[in-house]
Curated annotation (Swiss-Prot):
Its EC number is 5.4.3.8. It is found in: Cytoplasm. This is Glutamate-1-semialdehyde 2,1-aminomutase 2. It is an enzyme of class 5 (isomerase). Homodimer.
Length: 432
């Protein structure tokens, strides 16, 4: 494929934008470098770049675009918002409608509040949990991404009984020491951490199904055990459903798994492609939020009509009968096709697939936690990513990210993708 215009634009972007991108994940650093493709437009399941190339898209903007690009119902809602004014700074009837829709879909949300992003939503749930419990520390799980605010840019210390250390320049040591990080799916380590720090732990922050070191499901009984022990300790349980809300069913991963948290943070899908976040939970906890309580959260754009109307339209689309069954069907088809192609060419892969989301790891071993994901072959993934791009398939540029199937993908798209995988695996073997 010709990418000459993408290269020209990236060279220009480097002169004006830090690193040439507005989020590090877009830089292709995770696939060994190279020029990121600049997109011109998107429609349905397809991307079109500035050089005129067409791609089947599984990036889905890192998750939000579950209905495909430029869905007509969502486009109509955004157009209506633009015509009526996109920002008021006052209450609107639409935010009530949307709050009711979220509560009906995810019953643990007894009260909700809107923010501008998933990062803001997670950040505020931690503040609210601290206000409710009178404690300061949180426990989180290694490799789970919860946004880019200081408190969650923390990696594990030397073990479950040690405090965290900064994972980014600019995060202070004192901030990192408010966080204990333990391996996902490792209840023994969680139990040890709580035994040491329990009376200081305000909340346990969990991705109920991990989406940030690939798609990784909790082992049987893990979330239930975490809930039980956290509550026995007087700590709250926060589910970060920024990726998972409405991903696997019309509702949250908590509905899908049957395990209920005290607070939930959401984003991505619920905005229909526009910036949004939301959080909610038990009434007695949520009433700690201003103006009813002492935990402050505000935002100029929070609850803006454009994002709210886009979100309402997105959830209306997701109520289509049989949609999630189709996601499951296509997800299973992709997993099966990738595994068969890998076996044919003698390439070791593990495919973690949950409904319409999956991750292809270059390893023969299971992946159930961050350390196992980190041990997979990133060099092979980088070659695979670039090969798929040349075959007209757009993936996330990192071995840790997921493929997302949207309502716009057809069975023909899935079959074309499987054929591309077979072609790329063949070239990878030939190149060796």
């Amino acid at each position: 494929m010709d990418h000459s215009m993408s290269k020209k634009l990236h060279d220009e972007a480097l002169l004006h934008i830090v690193g040439g991108v507005n989020s590090p994940s877009r830089s292709n650093k995770g696939v060994g470098g190279g020029i990121p493709v600049t997109m011109e437009r998107a429609s349905g399941a397809y991307f079109y770049d500035v050089d005129g190339n067409k791609y089947i898209d599984y990036l889905a903007a890192f998750g939000p675009i579950i209905t495909g690009h430029a869905h007509p119902h969502i486009t109509e809602a955004i157009t209506k918002a633009a015509q009526n004014g996109v920002l008021y700074g006052t209450p609107t009837k639409h935010e009530i409608t949307f709050a009711k829709m979220l509560k009906e879909a995810i019953p643990s949300l007894e009260k909700v509040r809107f923010t501008n992003s998933g990062t803001e939503a997670v950040m505020t749930t931690i503040r609210v949990a601290r206000a409710y419990t009178g404690r300061d520390k949180i426990i989180k799980f290694a490799g789970c991404y919860h946004g880019h605010f200081d408190l969650v840019l923390v990696e594990a210390g030397s073990g479950p009984s040690t405090l965290g250390i900064p994972d980014s320049a600019g995060v202070t040591k004192s901030t990192a020491e408010e966080v204990i990080t333990v391996p996902f799916n490792d209840f023994a380590s969680f139990k040890e951490a709580l035994a040491v720090w329990g009376d200081q732990v305000a909340a346990v922050l969990v991705e109920p199904i991990v989406g940030n070191f690939g798609m990784v499901a909790p082992e049987d009984g893990f979330l239930e055990a975490v809930n039980e022990l956290a509550h026995a300790n007087g700590s709250l349980v926060i589910y970060d459903e920024v990726i998972t809300a409405f991903r696997f069913m019309y509702g949250g991963a908590q509905n899908y798994l049957g395990v209920i948290p005290d607070l939930t943070a959401m984003g991505k899908i619920i905005g229909g492609g526009l910036p949004i976040g939301a959080y909610g939970g038990r009434i007695d906890i949520m009433e700690k939020v201003a103006p009813l309580g002492p935990a402050y959260q505000a935002g100029t754009h929070a609850g803006n009509p454009a994002s709210i109307l886009s979100g309402i339209a997105c959830l209306e689309v997701l109520q289509e009968e049989g949609l999630y069954e189709r996601f499951e069907k296509y997800g299973s088809m992709l997993k099966d096709g990738i595994e068969k192609a890998a076996l044919k060419h003698g390439i070791a892969v593990t495919v973690n697939q949950i409904v319409g989301a999956l991750t292809v790891y270059f390893t023969e071993d299971p992946v159930t936690n961050y350390a196992e994901a980190g041990a997979t072959n990133g060099e092979l993934f980088g070659r695979f990513f670039k090969g798929m791009l040349e075959e007209g398939i757009n993936l996330a540029p990192s071995k840790y990210e997921a493929w997302f199937i949207t309502s716009a993908h057809s069975e023909a798209d899935i079959l074309e993708t499987i054929q591309a995988v077979d072609t790329v695996f063949g070239k990878m073997v030939q190149d060796n």
